[in-house]
């Protein structure tokens, strides 16, 4: 019974018996499930370019009828059939193909490009196509976090200060640590969020510390095999000399006492001067009376006044 099957969109019909076609489909399914049995593992950053090697040593023979497929899991990236290159829409304008080594170059990497890629080479033998080479390449992609930003976030109590560390734009999922002299400190309010569209992570955490001593605290963010960090330095405020306050108090008290004494002395002097003047005036008046009226008249006048 005839069997007409098509390997992929817009490719010629495969003219070989159904058992071999079924075997090929089983192979492609296994390619989409491969996680560890890969020939090579590569790690790149977002916006980088990567060369995925096919590792195929082609014999010196006619290659015009070879079929080369690059796939990512169960999705086709590009195909070369009868010398004609076809690139699938998701990879158009950002892929290059080396027709001598069958290598694939992807430009402007994005996070969605990560995964396991397979290079399949088929050759025509006795009228049918057989798989002659299979290479698996696992591509990991990371996005670098921004340099952490540490800010002061108030004082929960008199001798306690709170700081916040923040970073964004990274991938894969980060791990956060507060460190001082190599010792991990317990942070609070640590949050990790991921943007559903870009898949990039944002992370923030807070830490409370005692302000009565000096500190050098590190905010450390690890993601994949990379990390970023930032240091925060705190120096306790200088204290006043132990006797400076007492000196100021004593000086103020002494100055006040001096002013008080001066005021009292001035008042006493003014009072004495006034009293002395009053007595001199009285004595002068009595002398004048004695000279004017004589003793008897003066005595009579004094009696009248009494």
From Swiss-Prot:
- Cite the record's tissue specificity text: Expressed on activated B-cells, gamma interferon stimulated monocytes and non-circulating B-cell malignancies.
- Segments passing through the bilayer: 247-268
Q: Which residues form the Ig-like V-type domain?
A: 38-135
- Note the superkingdom of the native organism: Eukaryota
Where in this protein does the record put region Ig-hinge-like? 227-246
What molecular function terms (GO) are annotated for this protein? Answer: coreceptor activity
Q: Which residues are glycosylated?
A: 93, 99, 149, 189, 210, 214
* This protein's UniProt keywords: Cell membrane, Disulfide bond, Glycoprotein, Immunoglobulin domain, Membrane, Receptor, Signal, Transmembrane, Transmembrane helix
Extracellular topology: which positions? 38-246
Q: Which CDD domains match?
A: IgC1_CD80, IgV_CD80
Q: Which residues lie on this side of the membrane: Cytoplasmic?
A: 269-306
User: Could you say what a knockout of this gene produces?
Assistant: CD80-deletion mice have fewer T-follicular helper cells compared to WT, and residual T-follicular helper cells fail to mature.
An example Gene Ontology biological process: cellular response to lipopolysaccharide
Q: What GO CC terms are in its UniProt record?
A: external side of plasma membrane; protein complex involved in cell adhesion
Localization recorded for this chain is: Cell membrane
Give the SMART domains listed for this entry: IG (SM00409)
Question: Which residues are connected by disulfide bridges in this protein?
Answer: 54-119, 165-219
The UniProt record lists the Ig-like C2-type domain at 148-229
Q: How does it sit in the membrane?
A: Single-pass type I membrane protein
A Pfam family the protein falls into: V-set
Using the record, list the residue span of the signal peptide; answer none if the entry has no such feature: 1-37
User: Subunit notes for this chain?
Assistant: Homodimer. Interacts with CTLA4; this interaction inhibits T-cell activation. Interacts with PDL1/CD274; this interaction blocks PDL1/PDCD1 binding and thus PDL1 inhibitory function. Interacts with CD28.
Q: What does this protein do?
A: Costimulatory molecule that belongs to the immunoglobulin superfamily that plays an important role in T-lymphocyte activation. Acts as the primary auxiliary signal augmenting the MHC/TCR signal in naive T-cells together with the CD28 receptor which is constitutively expressed on the cell surface of T-cells. In turn, activates different signaling pathways such as NF-kappa-B or MAPK leading to the production of different cytokines. In addition, CD28/CD80 costimulatory signal stimulates glucose metabolism and ATP synthesis of T-cells by activating the PI3K/Akt signaling pathway.
Record's protein name: T-lymphocyte activation antigen CD80
Biological source species:
Mus musculus
